[in-house]
Amino acid sequence: GNVDPRMLTNSTKSDFRQMLTYLRDAGAKEIGEYFPNIPFDDPLNLNVFRQIEEFGFPLTFHIAPAIGGCYGVFDELGLPRLERVLREFPRLIFLAHSQPFWAEISRDVTEEGRRGYPTGPVTPGRAVELMRRYPNLHGDLSARSGYNALTRDPEFGYAFLEEFQDRLYFGTDIANVPQDLPQVPYFRKLKVERLISPEAFEKITWRNAARLLGLPQETAR
């Protein structure tokens, strides 16, 4: 399910509980992809986050590097606004997604680089720092952004998957059967060549999602 903080009265007093109740009763398990193109910590967003946290939904966000000309919640280099909301809503699970988040896996990210898919060795950056500091920050490994973050420095990628194996999720980004999905052969290689532990593989490819969405572990596969 999804909501936009500018709906209803376009104010910080908008009550989304009826909408969230409808989504929950209709079977929705998560909110997102959340991408209104306003600052991440805009009071309109904070109002929605507070209510989503109250309902217990996790939320997948898309970060934008600017306001205007793109979609996504806006944050600057270094992700200060994301940190604020992580701190303010400790019971709300945020699933990170998009280039401006995953580019921050390395400390040497630039303003230009966060708009695309940086290459080269990784020196652990803000994305890693925030995941270590805030247990409510999880990682959506879908799309080229998540894949690039894992594969630009293979050895770092394996270590990252192991360290955060309880908070990372295989994903497809969109429902498009014929799409090219490099994550599939990548994870098959991880399993066959034992590049990560069997436990990490199971968690990231399906167990974490089953747990997050409240699905029975024995029937989720």
What residue ranges belong to the model's regions?
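Conserved, mostly hydrophobic/aromatic
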Residues: L23, I52, G139, D173, ...
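Residue-level "edge-of-site" marker
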Residues: P36, P65, I204
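Short, surface-exposed amphipathic charged segments that create phosphate/polyanion-binding patches used
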Residues: K13-T21, P154-F156, P216-A220
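Conserved beta-strand termini and adjacent loop/short-helix elements that scaffold enzyme active sites
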Residues: N2, H97, S142, W206-R207
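Catalytic pocket-lining loop regions of alpha/beta-barrel enzymes
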Residues: K29-E30, D42-F170, P178
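Mid-to-C-terminal alpha-helical segments outside catalytic/metal-binding sites
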Residues: F164-Y169, A175-R221
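Ligand-binding grooves and catalytic loops that recognize ribose/phosphate and carbohydrate rings
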Residues: S14-T21, D25-A28, A66-R84, Q183-I196, ...
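Mid-domain alpha/beta scaffold segments of enzyme catalytic cores
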Residues: G1-N47, Q51-F55
